[in-house]
């Protein structure tokens, strides 16, 4: 889904945002899902990967990665990953508006997560494939 999409919003010292199928920030995959904010997953440092949204329950495909701590986003945007090394954060910090995602790859053991969300994933794929 993400391969070939642009980083359509880049704000220095704040974040980079991508995942819009239209490339300008107004698109979605055709479905929305609820927030899954947790006090254990916070925006307390650079490199937090979170869902971009337009308010509660409006998550779709857009995401952002922070350049710095952004505590004011806690409870408003679901954190679902993080940049794990300084070298990777340097890549995030070098991304400019309009840069294209060449390939998105999920690393690590995700089979239990995918199994627990199988019904939702099936529904989302039906929308994407329609």
State each model region's role.
Residues 1-130:
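Cyclophilin-like peptidyl-prolyl cis-trans isomerases
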């Amino acid at each position: 889904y993400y391969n070939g999409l642009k980083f359509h919003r880049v704000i220095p010292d704040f974040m980079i945002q991508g995942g819009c199928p239209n490339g300008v920030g107004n698109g979605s995959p055709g479905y929305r899902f609820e927030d899954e904010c947790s006090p254990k997953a916070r925006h307390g440092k650079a490199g937090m990967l979170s869902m971009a949204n337009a308010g509660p329950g409006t998550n779709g495909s857009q995401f952002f990665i922070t350049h710095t701590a952004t505590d004011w986003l806690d409870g408003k945007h679901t954190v679902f990953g993080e940049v794990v090394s300084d070298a990777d954060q340097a890549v995030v910090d070098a991304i400019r508006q309009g840069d294209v995602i060449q390939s998105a790859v999920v690393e690590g053991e995700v089979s239990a997560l995918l199994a627990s969300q199988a019904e939702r994933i099936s529904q989302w794929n039906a929308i994407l494939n329609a």
